[in-house]
């Protein structure tokens, strides 16, 4: 602990005496006149430079120019219903086609568009199978037949071990 303290004190002491380091920064007085002059210049600049409408300092001049051009274009050109400028003409057309297709084609009960036809069919088959087939005690559909079988086998093994210890 003392070694680290002495070492850090020595490094700071050396930095104080080298030119261009802490000593130079500390010896330059920060004048209040310079600070006030800087603030006055900054306020004059902000008063003289009026920003055009739609200008954002984070996006720059060209972005605001393109926004103004976009508003002129949108006034000149009328879009069809369902058009979105962020998606484009083709996207909105395909969305309309998709809605017409979904109206024409009725899905069977249990169908999910995220899983597909075969998944819903297998889910319906699974429910029919589960109604027809009763599960043995200890069976879990999440673990499978073999797991439950091994659990039942485990209880039989425990019974056999205890009977062998008694004899």
Swiss-Prot record:
InterPro entries cross-referenced by the UniProt entry: Bradykinin
This entry's Gene Ontology molecular function terms read:
hormone activity; toxin activity
Tissue pattern of expression reads: Expressed by the skin glands.
Swiss-Prot/TrEMBL keywords: Amphibian defense peptide, G-protein coupled receptor impairing toxin, Repeat, Secreted, Signal, Toxin, Vasoactive, Vasodilator
Q: Does the keyword Zinc-finger apply?
A: no
The record's section on Pfam families has: Bradykinin (PF06753)
Q: Please indicate which superkingdom the organism of origin belongs to.
A: Eukaryota
The alphabetized list of GO BP terms reads: defense response; vasodilation
Q: Where is the signal peptide?
A: 1-23
Q: Where in the cell is it found?
A: Secreted
Gene Ontology CC annotation, any one: extracellular region
Function recorded in the entry: Vasodilator. Bradykinin produces in vitro relaxation of rat arterial smooth muscle and constriction of intestinal smooth muscle. May target bradykinin receptors (BDKRB).
Give the protein family. Belongs to the bradykinin-related peptide family.
The name of this protein is Kininogen-1
